[in-house]
Amino acid sequence: MPKISKILLLAVSVVLVVAVFLGVNSNGVSAATEPQDGAYRQINVYSEVLRHIQTDYVEQPNITAVTNGALRGLLESLDADSSYLTPEDYKAYKADKGGKAQVGINVSKRYGYASVVSVVPGSPADKADISDGDIIEAIGPADTRDISLAMIQLLLEGQPGTELTLSVVRPRKSAPDKIVLTRVAPTLPPVTETLYENSSILYLKPGVLDRDHVQQIEMKLKGMSKAGNKKILLDLRDVAAGDMTEATRLANFFLKDGTIAMLEGQKVEKQTFTADASKAINTTAPVVVLVNRGTAGPAELVAAALLDNKRADLVGEKTFGEGAQQKTFELPDGAALILSIAKYESPSGKKLQDEGVTPGVLVASNVDQASAVDEDATPTETQAAPAKPSVTVDEQLSKALALLKNKAA
């Protein structure tokens, strides 16, 4: 469909949606007594556009297809996590029981197309050198610009052994790469543990902040004294998946008091999550947290809590900026809205969704941190001694270690 048709018909669908949101009846009379933010005045403009389309446009467009696209755009203009699902999409969405094979990509739709937030280490996507910041232009024949985030996530899943083709736009390349990936059953490695400085620095890197991985971190923190560990380096780079409840629990391991996070929405009463001294494990050991642009959601909550409570130094890059609570609203025609109804805030009141977390020590990424090597590392049971490949030294890791070395335990 010509671009002008899409633009004009966007206005048509907005008329209908605004009318629904604001309570306008079939005669154009508002159920409310006062206009809200001038929205009612805009309805007259949209109606005029509709009149011109009906009387002057060159051809009869497919109203259903364009309206669906306009509704997707309306939801996506709110934030990257909100989605509109057509009746067909929502039926497929409800039928998805989870646990399917995946390719190891955490995605967002902040920039129109699907963008890679982070990649699971060792996954098919990781082995294909897909990295955070890459743009997924298409999944098979489906242009990601024209489908919702929920459906993009659904298309990335499938049965083990099945293939999918991604069209990936990479920085500094003019043409997209066609990459074929084979879906595999999701497997997450245990928390990586490495020791530095004669075991005085305990390095921990989870791949996800779920119950199992947070429990692994808990056990390692509890064993620090026995192992002779005196300082902690928590690597949350490219950690984008997990659970906010588990993230709150992880932050509490390092805090005996203070606010961990807050959650608030237009119709969601403000909740404040406070540290419980009985659940704290180590509140005195020096801590440095590594973050980058692939740090999102639960990992951002942890980073913000430790930063604002002055419990840790943050090193790396500004994080992605994701932290909203969603709710699904079913519509009469079988369609649905996935709408952000509340946003998480840091202890200082910054919305994670809008602002992300900015480290006190900014260090640009110069290497794929999953393959970085530090010659001072001491292998542990959970990490075999690596070979010494020719890779660039991880400057973010080096800076974090330097900070910890200079801190008194």
PLM regions: where:
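Terminal targeting/pro-maturation regions of precursor/exported proteins
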Residues: 2-82, 109-110, 114, 229, ...
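Short capping micro-motif at the N-terminus of alpha-helices
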Residues: 146, 179, 263, 339, ...
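PDZ/PDZ-like peptide-tail recognition elements
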Residues: 69, 77-118
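Conserved functional hotspot residues or short segments at active or partner-binding sites
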Residues: 336, 343, 347-409
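Cleft-lining beta-strand/loop regions that shape enzyme active-site pockets
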Residues: 31-42, 48-58, 62-63, 115-118, ...
